[in-house]
From Swiss-Prot:
It is found in: Cytoplasm. InterPro entries: Aldolase_TIM, DapA, DapA-like, Schiff_base-form_aldolases_AS, Schiff_base-form_aldolases_CS. Pyruvate binds at residues 55, 214. It comes from Prochlorococcus marinus (strain SARG / CCMP1375 / SS120). Its main location: cytoplasm. This is 4-hydroxy-tetrahydrodipicolinate synthase. Pfam families: DHDPS (PF00701). The record marks 54, 117 as: Part of a proton relay during catalysis. Signal peptide: none annotated. The gene is dapA. Gene3D superfamilies: Aldolase class I (3.20.20.70).
Amino acid sequence: MSTVPEISSAPFGRLLTAMVTPFDTAGAVDFALAARLARYLVDQGSDGLIVCGTTGESPTLSWEEQYQLLETVRNAVNGSAKVLAGTGSNSTSEAIHATAKAAEAGADGALVVVPYYNKPPQAGLESHFRAVAQAAPDLPLMLYNIPGRTGCSISPITVQRLMNCSNIVSFKAASGTTNEVTDLRIRCGSRLAIYSGDDGLLLPMLSVGAVGVVSVASHIVGMRLKAMIEAYFAGENSLALSHHEQLQPLFKALFATTNPIPVKAALELIGWPVGAPRSPLLPLENQMKNELMKTISALLQT
């Protein structure tokens, strides 16, 4: 039986931003704005950036757009933060190709979502992720479980079976429950770095063994999130809880409708006009935008 090496507690840092994809008024990717936004997010506390994930609207980006975004963001941050590429697909061959391409392009890691729509059984999920891992053996991978989007969930037992793939080093937990973190910790221990995939559950997930977060809210309150994480790991639990409670209204507002619709509107409100989402997503309705503005204004006063 192979010996699986231990990994560092947070291989990509503790605060990762699932970065939006900026579009111009014609709906084309605004690569220059993506570069500026990437540098801003790092300045606001992000240890890593994930391009072309759910928040980055990967379903409506071509593979060529995704590869160019990866290159753009990597060049923009110039080693000051980890850059991960979303390379998941419900086609194993597509995921293999995209992950290998990300490795060739110099990504620091890849976010690989559970295959969506076709609902493979657990054996199929194991085979899928094993094949992707073997296609880019030197690229660290983060598995991504978000059953509300994919219609399918990878079980902790299946993840445990994948632990002999040495480059599967982390897991984005977005099932909406802390139980997933506990079950993974029991089965995989410190071998697997678990990241909260839900801003609102970050503090509870840290308390049961998560190492950090893949955040949407960090587009708006990166330094506040960083402060909460640092307070928690410094043992300042009351301070961490205070941050958690103060940020809850924003967390809820950013998921009042489908992500990334609200966060794109929020970015515009704070001076980053990143464009509307691509169809079939729509811009945030005016009433919800007004409520979002009130939430952000109130938060900035605390």
